[in-house]
Amino acid sequence: MTRYVLVTGAYGGMGSAAVKALAKRGFIVFALDRKVGEAVENIIPIEADVTDPDSLQRAFDSVRGLTDRLFAIIHYAGIYTLDSLVEIPDAGFERMFRVNVFGAFHVNKIFFTMLGDGSRIIMTTSELAPLDPLPFTGLYAVTKSALDKYAYSLRMELQLLGINVSVIRAGAVRTNISVSRPTRSTLSVGKQSSTNATPSTSEG
């Protein structure tokens, strides 16, 4: 039986690795990201922005045209910046929440009707960020903590429908999300911030 999986942040480091591994194992993977590659065997690129419900609705329509059931939704979409919690612009603060927290919320809400008994939702968070945040990574830690609590609460609700929700606490992985170019000094201790750098929207 053909099994279909939706992966967000599918063209980032961890997302891309997951997509390739799933495709190799015979899953048909809907690879969702803002910028996508060419379709290859078992991988169907879906261009969409997790912060834009209209974009996700179009993605849903594309997926729904090929199948009415998803075996799993796997979340890798996310952004990361280094910044001071007292200096980060409001727009930067809000954007990280829109991608890291609301992104998962929007995807799950829109694609929920394609899940059924035995389906799964897998959230990817940082192993250390929610538990032991470091200086200038506080906002990232806050969003990942929120995603943790969202996932655990969602698990209790969806288990009533036979849908499993899991959280993967990934350790440190060298990917584009962790490569940021400092652009200005922050605070008086000589630390650096990457607020003005272009963040990746793919976790990994």
Question: What role is predicted for each listed range?
Answer:
Residues 25-39:
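Conserved glycine-rich Rossmann-like NAD(P)H-binding loop of the short-chain dehydrogenase/reductase
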Residues 11:
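Conserved glycine-rich cofactor-binding loop
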Residues 84-85, 92-94:
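Substrate-binding pocket helix/loop in short-chain dehydrogenase/reductase
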Residues 122-146, 152, 156-159, 172, ...:
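Catalytic loop of short-chain dehydrogenase/reductase
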Residues 76-81:
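Conserved NAD(P)H cofactor-binding loop of Rossmann-fold oxidoreductase domains
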Residues 41-54:
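Rossmann-fold cofactor-recognition segment
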Residues 160-204:
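SDR active-site lid
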